[in-house]
Each structure stands twice: as structure tokens, then as C-alpha cells.
Curated annotation (Swiss-Prot):
Enzymatic reactions: L-tyrosyl-[protein] + ATP = O-phospho-L-tyrosyl-[protein] + ADP + H(+)
Extracellular side of membrane: 25-647
Regions of this protein lying in the Cytoplasmic compartment: 671-1210
Pfam families: Furin-like, GF_recep_IV, PK_Tyr_Ser-Thr, Recep_L_domain, TM_ErbB1
Protein name: Epidermal growth factor receptor
Signal peptide: 1-24
Length: 1210
């Protein structure tokens, strides 16, 4: 009988686990890993060889596993041995077809790529559909820290089937970035035996092994099956073969031979016999996630028992008993620095203001030190400023000088050379004039202050011309010299009798060997005893604090655990075992602060002790596993079952009572406030006087409509992106009571978002609800759930920046100039509405169709008041490289600062998505702008286009063009695009169909996106009439847009009647006046029904267009046809399809009143933009009340854009 697929999978898991457990006893081969990220090491061949040398036969990677720049024909079979990675795994920029990480079990994530990702698979593709296709990580079952990122892997198979929730910890799931492309035709399908269709590749062996999401509720982490008895030990990672800590496939923390442990066996154990910490013969060092008896070669041991490659700060490396260890430095760690005349100071005369910082933390000077008068005067020739005397304190760390010390200048108000108070030795290997190793000449000091100087190995000493210097003659210099022929020249200093007259003599506590100054710490040696570096008369043996004992004429402090005795000695020597009486407790011969509690002892047992009435520590009973308070078993019960449980119960009851009291107090407070408000409201309603406005602004009221949606009215389909504010979803809006689906983008704040973030998203909703323009993204609605959600129109082509980067080889001059016109129109509309955008960039322009773009992202936009001309920002993150200079320096934002950002946006388009000021830090932008530097002229731009950009970047904001002027300039250029933009092969370029866009495919590849209605179409009234003039927000037209282009105008809307939505705007969107239409577009594709004027459309055969509302118009001309751009001087009459030659065939009887059809020359429209009031409504009427058609010569009135819907009909 053949075993089932599930049985075979289980058997395979068991065999793998047994092999891993058996192999755990063997020492695994480790390798360091790399941290090169995306850096290429030499040629492709050199890079690959470096990779092969690093990971050949490697099983554990201590650092990061980075597989980059591997070409198609290279063999990566040496990666099969890798089982564990301590850092992150980066697989990027490869064209090799298969990367066999078949035995990789765990990624620990001790270091993360971009501080977020433990596994990053990025841009693994080449030309001609080559690249990474297979990544069989069939044994990867655990990522301890970090998330996963996939991006730009167009032919990588099966990754979309993996259940990452089983591998990644739940806390990191929100950081996942999964840009996966599915290729069912070319990729192998998962084996039918794979659980839930999850696999790493074709075949049963590549099925994903689930060890977390299938576990029973009783399991804390991993399991080997669905039963509660299949739970793994909590020390296990990536699964197990049994319930014990020795049955783990991989250890979560440390592996000690075949057992998983929380920590490695300690190096020291408590000995209850000697009352000391003894060396543990079973102790081990931690090396990565493994416990080892000794650290590998070239590693050093820390105090905590870890193997590291280098000691930390304040530690130095030393060898003891054949083991390299890290020892804590006594003071600053040794640091050798070059002296004057060596290395970087080769041509330097003296320590000065520019080089003094190089001596910071130096303990040894290799060479000489000179301090000359030029240091304090400065040097105008070399532009060296005077030295600040306080900076000489840097030299206090210097203990050794291998050459000589020359001091010919010193601060006048300093009385000694205390900057060198820690100098211990002057070796004199080089000498001034070949003679002197210490020279102090012409200073105003009273003492030398070299209190730590113990040796001058070679060279003479000269101390001369210091008119106030005393004490120098008291020093026994011969005792400091290293050779008998060394001499001193101490002359022309202050006379000895003058020094005695002013009491500049050695302290009485100094011995006859002399002193360096007047203080007791300046003595060369002490007359009596010393405490540290200072001479004292006597030690604190019987009185005083702290208590001391005498050793070699030095006062040594007693151990802190010794109890001070009244008029008696406190201790007899060093350590806690020489105390006369203990301050706290006594454990054997030692004084201790507390009795041992839970200290690791022999045989991995914890040692517990209690103190008796005499504060002597005694061992607890062997069965007392949590400590004791007395002898025997009865002492064990005091802590666990005595006061502990009642105290816990008391704490719980007390906490509950406190919560109840607080709740009652809050309730009473809210009740009281409600009553006060109610009374205040009643009193106000009874007032007869009305409050008169004191400062009317005269500004028109904002009558924008804000739609409040229920959460049941829309459905989230997939995540489009996430950030600090929250998450953006693709979804469908299904209005209540209507059978339509509208694709939308849903912007949702994170849980527990701050009140500031809530305010910011509501401010953004206010701005978006206040706008209504074809080239500005508008708000469809807002949902006020616990996390505020904004619902906007979905743009399936993504942002304009990504769009031009993806299609840069197919974008012609016409499209670029049209986009410039449309963005300028949108910004001009915002300026008319007194809105400052503050974040205009190509990334914040969305593509509705290739001919229609919209401005979005109003997160930084501000609405100016009636009297405001500019906005002053307070702080926050801002796009420096797109901002005007006044915005960077003074945080001033105006409509003219938006013009600057517009210029940068145009530059992004003309360079097909290049980064502005690439390689220049944002902190340097303001300085280079002030110096006159600007973005370079794009290669495709003529000087006409570039001069417009330059005008946008003028320092004087008033000198920049207005958006109205920019519309005129770019509209003129769009009528003759190849004159202003020079693109090779421009006449043959055309944008691909929507489905060729990667973003479009990823966005629309959902079965829920069928039979949808575009938001613009839903909001624009369908063919028919309003119920009454009172409900209409626009004047009634004789004809509206038809629902089909192959029928006469019909009065049919979605609900089968002639009524339209009351909240819809008539003539909401207009086609771009500069959009390009070819004869082929007109003859062979669907021509959209005019929305603004009554234009006729010739009937077409019934089968030519299945659903004209969703049909996409071709974007490229037919071969052999000349492309006709809109030109106001062309003869548009020659094409009768653009003229109003037909009358509506359906008129409701409710509109027979002539008054409803009488139009005046000045139309009062409720549209937001006065430009559209002027340009898109006829100003003349026929006697019969029907509007006249637009002037054929004016391209602004022609409907030449493709359909507004970007969705293809089913």
C-alpha cells in the first residue's frame, strides 16, 4: 500500500529532524558572513569567487548572508550546506535561475536589512525574461526577528503560495512588503499533497512544512502536528521531533550539545563549602547560538563568558593562561598618537587650535610635544586662530612621551603645568637640540605640578627663565633619571629665599625627597602615610570614615561589608573575610550583603540560604526549591504558601476596588458636566438677543459636500502600501441601495494613533472635500470608525513618477507636455481656492489614464484665510529637494513656493523619473541654492522648456510665473511638441495598453474588480433630467451624456428611471484641451460622448463595441497616419463629428415650461472654478431655447480625449 502525501511529508520531517539532532553533536562549520549590502566587489567573476570562498562548506553564518550580482551561468550548489543565519538574508540583483538554500532552517535576524527585514529578495531579473525563477527554501521554518520583503522579481515562482504567518513572528507581520508577481503559465504548480497549496517549488519535497499555524491552543510556539500532545518545548525553534528540549530541530536561544537551553552553563559556580565562587568545570562560552568549551581561534573572551571578535570600549585585550581575554582599562584605555613632527604633524611647529583635538584620549605620544608662543597668538599666515587655554585639558590623559616635552608658552593665569599632571614617563628617544628631553622656559608658573612623573629615561632637563617658579630645586632629579650622565639646568627662576618669604615651600607632610607644588598631593613621597596619591598624617583606623588599615605606609579602605567599630579596628586586611564584624550577614568566613539566593551550584542546582537570629547564613532544606525563611521543610512553606498568596489576593482586590472608585468618580463628573451643559443651553435658548458678528470676513462660505460612508458600504480587497500614518487598501465602494461597484482607495489610520495624527487626516479630508477639478484627486467619502478612513478614487496606473520610469522608452513629447499642462491646471485651481499644496512632486501626481493625471496627497496642504498671503509652518518632515528656498530657510509657504515645486516636478518628468539633486545631502540644498546652483537642463529639453523651469526657481518669489501663465506656455508647446522636446523616435512612440503596466496588473488582478463603475461615471449624472430645478446644483441642459454611442440619447439611468443623484455635479470633468487624437482613434475606436455640450456621435455597428462605457481607446496611431495635435488655427469644421448637429430625442414632459430653457448671457453656476464657468458654457442661446454648439475653431470646446473609465468591460 502506497503511503499518502501527508504521511510522506511527516516521515520526511522526522528524518530531517533526526539527522539534525544527530548532527548537533558534531561541531558545525561557521563563517563570518558579510555586510556589503548592494556593493559589488570587483568584476562579476571576482564577486562570485569571494562569495564561494566565504560560504563553501559553511553551515552557520554568524553575520549576514548576502547573495548579490550572481550571473546566469554560475553554480551556487555550495550554498546547500547553510542551515542557520544569525543576521539577515539578502538576495538581490541576480540573474541566476536557481539559488539552492535547501537546508536553511532559521534566520535569527540579529541584524536587519534597512533595520526592518530579515529576508529581502530584490530585483533579481535580467534581459529577455531571465532572472531568478526558483528559490527552494523548503526547510525555512523560523524567522525570529524581522519581516520579509519581495520586490521586482518578475519571474520568481511560487512565493505567493507561501504562508508567511507560519514563519514570521506575529509582531513583525505589519512590516511585510510583498510585491509578488504570479506566473501560472510558466511556473510549476504545487504538488496536490502540499497543505493549502503552499510550496517552494514543484514536487512533493518542496511543500511548505507548517509548524505554527496548525498548532493546538495548548502549544506556546511550535509543534509537529495538530494534537495537543504534539507541542514542542518552548526552547525549540523551526519545529521538533518530540516534546523535550533535546528534540528541537533548531534552538531558539542556545544549543548545548544536543540540548536547547536558555543560557550556556556558567563559568563560575557557588561552592557552599568554601563559600566562594569556584570555576565550573562544565562551564562553556557562548559563541553565536552555540555553547562551546573554548572560543575559536582569533576570538577573545568577555567577562560574561562570550566569544567576541574585539573588545568593547574601556576594555583592552590581554592573554591569561593561554586565553585571550578582555580586561577593563584602569582609567582611559591606551591610545598611541603621533607627536609634533611625525605623520600628520610632520610640518607642524607646535600644538595649536587646529590640531589639539587630535590628542583627545591619547595616553602615549609617539614623538615630541611642543607648546610655543605662536599657539596662543595664532598664525595669520596659515590662518590658525589662537588656542583656547581650556583645550589644553585634553592633554590630561597623556601618561607617556617617547620623545621630549618642550614648553615655551603657557596661559598667564595658570600657576602650574596641571595639564600634564598624569604624565608618568618621558623616554627622551629624541631630544631638543640633541640634548634636552624636558624643557620649561620663560613661563609665569609658580610650580611645575608634574606630580605623577616617575622617570626621565634619557636626556637632560632645563628649567630656566621662570621668574615666579619655586619648588624645582627640591626635586631629587637623579632619582628620576635613567642614566648616570643625565644633567639638570635649573637657573634664572625665583630665588629660594624669596620663595620661603612667600611660604612657597613643600607641605610638612612631604618627605625630604621634595615636591612638585604646595599641596599634600604634590609630594614626591610622604613623611607619614598616604591615601591614594595624597599624603596624610594618619589613617582612619579607630575613627573617621571610611575605616582603613595600614599596608606599606598606605591607607587601605576596609571592605564595605565590614561594620565600623567604635574606637577599635574595623578590619585586618583586604576583602570581606578580614572584617572584625559584618555589617549585614556572614556566610562562612565572608561578610555578605544578602545570603545566597538562587545562585547556580553544582549539578545545575540552585543554592538557597536563610539567615538565623545572629545573621549567619545556613543552607535551606534540599526540597526547598524557592528559598526558605528557616530550617527544615517547615521553613520552605513560609514564602511560597505563606505571605505570597494572601498578598497577591490583597493586591488584586485592592486594585479592583481602586478601579471601581475611579470609574464612579468619572461617572459622577461626566453626569455633572452634562447637567451644567443642559442648563447653559436652556438659558441660551431663552435669550432674545442675537449675537452680532464683530469681524465679518466677507469670504464666501465653503459649501463643499462631505459624504459620510458606513463601513458596510465598502470592501477592502488588498493592501496597496503602508507607512507611519497607517495603511492604504484597494477596495470597492458599494453604495447602499444601489447595484454598482466603484473601485476606490481606502486610507486607514493605524490603531492607537495619536490625536495629532487623527487631526492631520481630518485636515486632509477637509482639503480634499473642498476641491472639485478634473486634475485634482477628490474625496469620495469618509468613514468615522475607531480608525478614521478616507475613501478616494482608485488610480490603477499608480503615481506619475513610477509610470514615467516604467514606460520611459514609450513616452513621447506630446504626453509629457500634456501632463505639464494638466498639473498646472490643477495647481491653478488650488490657487484659486487659496490652497497651498506644499508637497507637489511627481510621486504625488496619479495617473487616471495615460492622457489624464490628477494631483493628490494633501497631507501637507493648507487652506489660507481671507486675509492670509502665506503660511508659516512650525515643523515636521518636509520634502527639502522640492521646496523653494524661502520654505527651507524660513518655513514660508505660498502659491509661488508651489511654483518652485512645479518646476522640480516638470524636471522629474523631462528626465523620466530621475532624482533631483541626487547624491547631495538634504542639509546642503539650501547652501547650493543660495550660491545659484540649479538642476541641470534635461537632455530632451530645448532651451524654451528649460527657461520655464529656471523661471520657477527664481530666488524672488514674485519673479516666478503664475500657474495661469504656465498653462498658456505649456499649452502653446503642446500644439507643436516636437519643436520643444527632442526625443529620438518620438513619432513612433506610443504608450502600451493598460495591462502592460506592472502596477496595473498587480492592482486589477482580482476577480472582485469585474463589473465595476468608475467613480467619475458614478458621480456624473446619467442621460436624463433632474427631478426639479430646486434639487439641481447646475443649470439644466437640453441634453446630457448618453449611455451608449450607438443609440440616440436615452433617458435611462442605473435604476431604470430618469432621476439622477442629487449630490452629483453636472459637467464635473473636462477632457484635456491639449490631448492628442488621431484619425485612427476617431475611426476605429469608441469616441466618448461629450459631457459639456450637445455633440452628436455617428452610429456604429452594433457589434463594434460591446460596452462603450468601459472600452479603452487605443493610444497609438495606425501605421501611415499623421498625428494631428490640437491647433486652434486648424479647420475643425472638416470633421463634423465634433460639431453639435443633432438635437436630443428624449425630452421629459416636466420641462415644457419655457422659463426653464431661457438662458442669460451671464450664467450663475455653482462650479468651484470660474474658468470653467466662462469657458465651457455657451453664452448665446437659440430662439428655441436649445444651446448653440461651441465654436469649431476653439480646441478648448472639443471633446477629443479617450474615455474617462480606465477599466475594461467584461
Amino acid at each position: 500500500m502506497r503511503p499518502s502525501g501527508t504521511a510522506r511529508t511527516t516521515l520526511l520531517v522526522l528524518l530531517t529532524a533526526l539527522c539534525a539532532a544527530g548532527g548537533a553533536l558534531e561541531e558545525k562549520k561557521v563563517c563570518q558572513g558579510t555586510s556589503n549590502r548592494l556593493t559589488q566587489l570587483g568584476t562579476f567573476e571576482d564577486h562570485f569567487l569571494s562569495l564561494q570562498r566565504m560560504y563553501n562548506n559553511c553551515e552557520v553564518v554568524l553575520g549576514n548572508l548576502e547573495i548579490t550580482y550572481v550571473q546566469r551561468n554560475y553554480d551556487l550548489s555550495f550554498l546547500k550546506t547553510i542551515q542557520e543565519v544569525a543576521g539577515y538574508v539578502l538576495i538581490a540583483l541576480n540573474t541566476v535561475e536557481r539559488i539552492p538554500l535547501e537546508n536553511l532552517q532559521i534566520i535569527r535576524g540579529n541584524a536587519l536589512y534597512e533595520n526592518t527585514y530579515a529576508l529581502a529578495i530584490l530585483s533579481n531579473y535580467g534581459t529577455n525574461r531571465t532572472g531568478l525563477r526558483e528559490l527552494p527554501m523548503r526547510n525555512l521554518q523560523e524567522i525570529l526577528i524581522g519581516a520579509v520583503r519581495f520586490s521586482n522579481n518578475p519571474i520568481l515562482c511560487n512565493m505567493d503560495t507561501i504562508q508567511w504567518r507560519d514563519i514570521v513572528q506575529n509582531v513583525f507581520m505589519s512590516n511585510m512588503s510583498m510585491d509578488l508577481q504570479s506566473h501560472p503559465s510558466s511556473c510549476p504548480k504545487c504538488d496536490p499533497s502540499c497543505p493549502n497549496g503552499s510550496c517552494w517549488g514543484g514536487g512533493e519535497e518542496n511543500c511548505q512544512k507548517l509548524t505554527k499555524i496548525i498548532c493546538a491552543q495548548q502549544c506556546s510556539h511550535r509543534c509537529r502536528g495538530r494534537s495537543p500532545s504534539d507541542c514542542c518545548h518552548n526552547q525549540c525553534a523551526a519545529g521538533c521531533t518530540g516534546p523535550r528540549e533535546s528534540d528541537c530541530l533548531v534552538c531558539q536561544k542556545f544549543q548545548d550539545e544536543a540540548t536547547c537551553k536558555d543560557t550556556c552553563p556558567p563559568l563560575m559556580l557557588y561552592n557552599p563549602t568554601t563559600y566562594q565562587m569556584d570555576v565550573n568545570p562544565e562551564g562553556k562560552y557562548s559563541f553565536g547560538a552555540t555553547c562551546v568549551k573554548k572560543c575559536p581561534r582569533n576570538y577573545v573572551v568577555t567577562d560574561h563568558g562570550s566569544c567576541v571578535r574585539a573588545c568593547g570600549p574601556d576594555y583592552y585585550e590581554v592573554e591569561e593562561d593561554g586565553i585571550r581575554k578582555c580586561k577593563k582599562c584602569d582609567g582611559p584605555c591606551r591610545k598611541v598618537c603621533n607627536g609634533i613632527g611625525i605623520g600628520e604633524f610632520k610640518d607642524t611647529l607646535s600644538i595649536n587650535a587646529t590640531n589639539i583635538k587630535h590628542f583627545k584620549y591619547c595616553t602615549a605620544i609617539s614623538g615630541d610635544l611642543h607648546i610655543l608662543p605662536v599657539a596662543f597668538k595664532g598664525d595669520s599666515f596659515t590662518r590658525t586662530p589662537p588656542l583656547d587655554p581650556r583645550e589644553l585639558e585634553i592633554l590630561k590623559t597623556v601618561k607617556e612621551i617617547t620623545g621630549f616635552l618642550l614648553i615655551q608658552a603657557w596661559p598667564d593665569n595658570w600657576t602650574d603645568l596641571h595639564a600634564f599632571e598624569n604624565l608618568e614617563i618621558i623616554r627622551g628617544r629624541t631630544k631638543q637640540h640633541g640634548q634636552f628631553s624636558l624643557a620649561v622656559v620663560g613661563l609665569n608658573i609658580t610650580s611645575l605640578g608634574l606630580r605623577s612623573l616617575k622617570e626621565i629615561s634619557d636626556g637632560d632637563v632645563i628649567i630656566s627663565g621662570n621668574r615666579n617658579l619655586c619648588y624645582a630645586n627640591t626635586i631629587n632629579w637623579k632619582k628620576l633619571f635613567g642614566t648616570p650622565n643625565q644633567k639638570t639646568k635649573i637657573m634664572n627662576n625665583r630665588a629660594e629665599k624669596d620663595c620661603k618669604a612667600v611660604n612657597h615651600v613643600c607641605n610638612p607632610l612631604c618627605s625630604s625627597e621634595g615636591c612638585w607644588g604646595p599641596e599634600p598631593r604634590d609630594c614626591v613621597s610622604c613623611q607619614n602615610v598616604s591615601r591614594g596619591r595624597e599624603c596624610v598624617e594618619k589613617c582612619n583606623i579607630l575613627e573617621g570614615e571610611p575605616r582603613e588599615f595600614v599596608e606599606n605606609s598606605e591607607c587601605i579602605q576596609c571592605h564595605p561589608e565590614c561594620l565600623p567599630q567604635a574606637m577599635n579596628i574595623t578590619c585586618t586586611g583586604r576583602g570581606p573575610d578580614n572584617c572584625i564584624q559584618c555589617a549585614h550577614y556572614i556566610d562562612g568566613p565572608h561578610c555578605v550583603k544578602t545570603c545566597p539566593a538562587g545562585i547556580m551550584g553544582e549539578n545545575n542546582t540552585l543554592v538557597w540560604k536563610y539567615a538565623d537570629a545572629n545573621n549567619v547564613c545556613h543552607l535551606c532544606h534540599a526540597n526547598c526549591t524557592y528559598g526558605c525563611a528557616g530550617p527544615g521543610l517547615q521553613g520552605c512553606e513560609v514564602w511560597p504558601s505563606g505571605p505570597k498568596i494572601p498578598s497577591i489576593a490583597t493586591g488584586i482586590v485592592g486594585g479592583l476596588l481602586f478601579i471601581v472608585v475611579v470609574a464612579l468618580g468619572i461617572g459622577l463628573f461626566m453626569r455633572r458636566r452634562h447637567i451644567v451643559r443642559k442648563r447653559t443651553l436652556r438659558r441660551l435658548l431663552q435669550e432674545r438677543e442675537l449675537v452680532e458678528p464683530l469681524t465679518p470676513s466677507g469670504e464666501a462660505p465653503n459649501q463643499a459636500h462631505l459624504r459620510i460612508l458606513k463601513e458596510t458600504e465598502f470592501k477592502k480587497i488588498k493592501v496597496l502600501g503602508s507607512g507611519a500614518f497607517g495603511t492604504v487598501y484597494k477596495g470597492l465602494w458599494i453604495p447602499e441601495g444601489e447595484k454598482v461597484k466603484i473601485p476606490v482607495a481606502i486610507k486607514e489610520l493605524r490603531e492607537a494613533t495619536s490625536p495629532k495624527a487623527n487631526k492631520e487626516i481630518l485636515d486632509e479630508a477637509y482639503v480634499m472635500a473642498s476641491v472639485d477639478n478634473p486634475h485634482v484627486c477628490r474625496l469620495l467619502g469618509i468613514c468615522l470608525t475607531s480608525t478614521v478612513q478616507l475613501i478616494t478614487q482608485l488610480m490603477p496606473y499608480g503615481c506619475l513618477l513610477d509610470y514615467v520610469r516604467e514606460h520611459k522608452d514609450n513616452i513621447g513629447s506630446q504626453y509629457l507636455l500634456n501632463w505639464c499642462v494638466q498639473i498646472a491646471k490643477g495647481m491653478n485651481y488650488l490657487e484659486d481656492r487659496r490652497l497651498v499644496h506644499r508637497d507637489l512632486a511627481a510621486r504625488n501626481v496619479l495617473v487616471k489614464t495615460p492622457q489624464h493625471v490628477k494631483i493628490t496627497d494633501f497631507g501637507l496642504a493648507k487652506l489660507l484665510g481671507a486675509e492670509e498671503k502665506e503660511y508659516h509652518a512650525e515643523g515636521g518632515k518636509v520634502p527639502i529637494k522640492w521646496m523653494a528656498l524661502e520654505s527651507i530657510l524660513h518655513r514660508i509657504y505660498t502659491h509661488q513656493s508651489d511654483v518652485w515645486s512645479y518646476g522640480v516636478t516638470v524636471w522629474e518628468l523631462m528626465t523620466f523619473g530621475s532624482k533631483p539633486y541626487d547624491g547631495i545631502p538634504a542639509s546642503d540644498i539650501s547652501s547650493i541654492l543660495e550660491k545659484g546652483e540649479r538642476l541641470p537642463q534635461p537632455p530632451i529639453c530645448t532651451i524654451d522648456v528649460y527657461m520655464i523651469m529656471v523661471k520657477c526657481w527664481m530666488i524672488d518669489a514674485d519673479s516666478r510665473p503664475k500657474f495661469r501663465e504656465l498653462i498658456l506656455e505649456f499649452s502653446k508647446m503642446a500644439r507643436d511638441p516636437q519643436r520643444y522636446l527632442v526625443i529620438q523616435g518620438d513619432e513612433r512612440m506610443h504608450l502600451p495598453s493598460p495591462t502592460d503596466s506592472n502596477f496595473y496588473r498587480a492592482l486589477m488582478d482580482e476577480e472582485d474588480m469585474e463589473d465595476v463603475v468608475d467613480a467619475d461615471e458614478y458621480l456624473i449624472p446619467q442621460q436624463g433630467f433632474f427631478n426639479s430645478p430646486s434639487t439641481s446644483r447646475t443649470p439644466l441642459l437640453s441634453s446630457l451624456s448618453a449611455t451608449s454611442n450607438n443609440s440616440t440619447v436615452a433617458c435611462i439611468n442605473r435604476n431604470g428611471s430618469c432621476r439622477v443623484k442629487e449630490d452629483a455635479f453636472l459637467q464635473r470633468y473636462s477632457s484635456d484641451p491639449t490631448g492628442a487624437v488621431t484619425e485612427d482613434n476617431i475611426d476605429d475606436a469608441f469616441l466618448p460622448v461629450p459631457e459639456y455640450v450637445n455633440q452628436s456621435v455617428p452610429k456604429r455597428p452594433a457589434g463594434s463595441v460591446q460596452n462603450p462605457v468601459y472600452h479603452n481607446q487605443p493610444l497609438h496611431p495606425a501605421p501611415g497616419r499623421d498625428l494631428h495635435y490640437q491647433n486652434p488655427h486648424s479647420n475643425a469644421v472638416g470633421n463634423p463629428e465634433y460639431l453639435n448637429t443633432a438635437q436630443p430625442t428624449c425630452l421629459s414632459s416636466g420641462f415644457n415650461s419655457p422659463a426653464l430653457w431661457i438662458q442669460k448671457g451671464s450664467h450663475q453656476m455653482s462650479l468651484d472654478n470660474p474658468d470653467y464657468q466662462q469657458d465651457f458654457f455657451p453664452k448665446e442661446t437659440k430662439p428655441n431655447g436649445i444651446f448653440k454648439g461651441p465654436t469649431a475653431e476653439n480646441a478648448e470646446y472639443l471633446r477629443v480625449a479617450p474615455p474617462s473609465s480606465e477599466f475594461i468591460g467584461a
